[in-house]
Amino acid sequence: SYMPPKAKFTKQQIAEAGLDIIRNEGMENLTARALGKRLGSSACPIFTVFENMEEVQAEINKAARAVYSEYVKKGLKEELAFKGVGTQYIMFAIKEPRLFQLLFMSEQSQQPSVSKVLPVIDDNYEAILLSVQNCYNLSKEKSERLYKHLWIYTHGIAVLCATNMCTFTADEIANMISEVFKGTLKEIIGAEQ
């Protein structure tokens, strides 16, 4: 009897399966075999779509970034977009700890400076920076300084949450970000006078 060839999977389907594996079992369990199994097949069809496992991982990273971007977009809609984004960054770490670890806690191949890290990590960097410049009437340079301080602080909270070392309520997070933001803003504006 004639067996039609198994339907091939799209890059999107393979990436989604990869995200599932990472979410449930962790990055270390992401193998071609595990992907095939998750898709109900062998590993073979994966390599008709991708050249190798590195390409698969790049696509999964892209899919994880898309999930993260949804959080950022939500933050950008808030009245204080800058604070909104910081809060959403932490929410992403709380709700998607393994995707957060994949995107923001993996060792980098080269060590860029912080001002390079932020745009690389965040496609939304320009939008966030503009919201700071406009809301607080700051120069680009001062906005970047403010953003850098806040991002480092926010990243610290997010890492504590993503690794289950600490838990904070939404109110605590909002208050912590506000205090550091106001203090840093005062310092940066005060430096002018």
Question: Can you say where each PLM-predicted feature lies in the sequence?
Answer:
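N-terminal intrinsically disordered/low-complexity leader segments
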Residues: 1-9, 192-193
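N-terminal positioning helix adjacent to the helix-turn-helix/winged-helix DNA-binding module
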Residues: 10, 14-17, 64, 146
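Helix-turn-helix
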Residues: 13, 17, 21-55, 59
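Amphipathic alpha-helical linker/stalk segments
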Residues: 58-84, 118, 123-134
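Hydrophobic alpha-helical connector segments
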Residues: 72-99, 147-150
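Short secondary-structure transition hinges
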Residues: 91, 98-130, 159, 163, ...
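Amphipathic alpha-helical packing segments from all-alpha helical-bundle domains
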Residues: 110-137, 144-148, 175-189
